[in-house]
Amino acid sequence: MVSILSNIGMMVVTFKRPSLFTSLRRRSANNIIITKHSHPISTTRRSGNYKPTMWDFQFIQSLHNPYEGDKYMKRLNKLKKEVKKMMMTVEGSHDEELEKLELIDNLERLGVSYHFKDEIMQIMRSINININIAPPDSLYTTALKFRLLRQHGFHISQDILNDFKDENGNLKQSICKDTKDILNSSKDEHDNLKQSTCNNTKGLLKLYEASFLSIENESFLRNTTKSTLAHLMRYVDQNRCGEEDNMIVELVVHALELPRHWMVPRLETRWYISIYERMSNANPLLLELAKLDFNIVQATHQQDLRILSRWWKNTGLAEKLPFSRDILVENMFWAVGALFEPQHSYFRRLITKVIVFISIIDDIYDVYGTLDELELFTLAIQRWDTKAMEQLPDYMKVCYLALINIINEVAYEVLKNHDINVLPYLTKSWADLCKSYLQEAKWYHNGYKPNLEEYMDNARISIGVPMVLVHSLFLVTNQITKEALDSLTNYPDIIRWSATIFRLNDDLGTSSDELKRGDVSKSIQCYMNEKGASEEEAIEHIEFLIQETWEAMNTAQSKNSPLSETFIEVAKNITKASHFMYLHSDVKSSISKILFEPIIISNVAFALK
């Protein structure tokens, strides 16, 4: 908040702004005492009162994962060969399309599909070629087919779902029954829901999941999201099926918490393994492969983390900048969410270092720096020259030089591997980020309230996603084209859509209590001020914008792009991570399950003998 202390000619400025990777929410305001001429008389600085990390250097270095051993890799490779044989058998079958679809769906949910990319694409191409001559399918099969084809980049029309539309272009009421119909006409002799009704719910669940892959101007799919959601919520409320169908309830509840298309892949895998092993039709070969692969990949992530932990300790920045958060593990979790596969360690280690500096600089702008210092730091970032350090206070000099070293390291690696000097693109992204930070500081300092459009134009930069994705582009792309470089001038659509969703999720996760303590206005408050809307109406509008932006993101993915498939996957996964990190309360528990807690494999000892 800003108040004028006219008797001494001073202003007390409180500024607080969340940015990328601030999942540990700030809890108090920042008081900076400056004169009306913006020259410090006295400065009351504070730490953020952040709690010490629960995953310190000793803990990380002491991590020991037995699944790093060669014997487990041998078993994994043997299981992979067995699964490939199974896939070849399934691929050769012309009659069991559903079996093929469910196999691919399970491989993806179990987190092992990356081992079988070629085999999966061969099956999907075959399904796509025969799509117009295949006989009519059930809702379950058709919805699953539609989602998987779109997910794998095939241009499949929503018209494949025409058999399930009524004359008005809506989902048939016979498919999506109301509560009264279910209660009165769908019970069996044991007063439970008929199996046909439970099967229908499986189909509606698949349709609900598929609807989130809609692109622009697909009103049927957008309306389908609402109608299937209503049915699935009623189904959960009733929960009257037998023991087998309690599994369906779990699947529905999980989907309603966060749509499949918006879920972080690694979190989905950890959850689904625990579900799959309780299914009566679970394939023991797939189950063992999934568990073993999860633990081996986790061992790779722990190795990444040990290396990063030593790097972080050697920088000495934790001691030099005690006001900043020590959240190395949380920062690396974003990198794991972006690309978890073991072959991407190089990407995870470098991008985690970049993210670490986002959180440090975020704390400088948010917690510690005066407005004068922030202006000097922003200018220094724009110059990207060690001589620019001369005007900075000592604590900023340390951060500034360390940042230059890390980003120059990234640029050197790209130059070495691709013969392209990307430093101008990297430094521009940092300059854009710091300018957006400073803009928000000035808005608050001057008491200015932007409208929603003006706020978002700046906020989609200040969230940090464009900067992270620019660095990611150069770290995951094998062939960097001139067209891809040119697209970075104003940030391509995929980056802007990802940043927009990320920012809106961050804003939804900002509590009203935080705003009272001095947080700047977010998109919700901007919309309320601009439209005279209630908070509930504003939240509903922001949620609508998120879904609309996902449609734009899906549309952008469906078009030819100069950007690599791996980069687009990173952009999507970063976006998915924002849904979880900002809107769920059990983040630390989830991080532990992904990075530190292996899955128990009861039969692995026997298998390895």
From Swiss-Prot:
GO cellular component terms attached to this protein's record: chloroplast
Entry EC number(s): 4.2.3.26
Principal place of residence: plastid
Induction line: Induced by spider mite feeding, wounding and jasmonate (JA).
Tissues of expression: Highly expressed in young fruits and plant tops. Expressed in flower buds and trichomes of petioles and stems. Expressed at low levels in young leaves, stems, petioles, sepals and petals.
Function: Involved in monoterpene (C10) biosynthesis in glandular trichomes. Converts geranyl diphosphate to linalool in glandular trichomes in response to jasmonate (JA). Can convert farnesyl diphosphate to nerolidol in vitro.
Name of the protein this chain belongs to: (R)-linalool synthase TPS5, chloroplastic
Upper taxonomic lineage: Eukaryota, Viridiplantae, Streptophyta, Embryophyta, Tracheophyta
Gene coding for it: TPS5
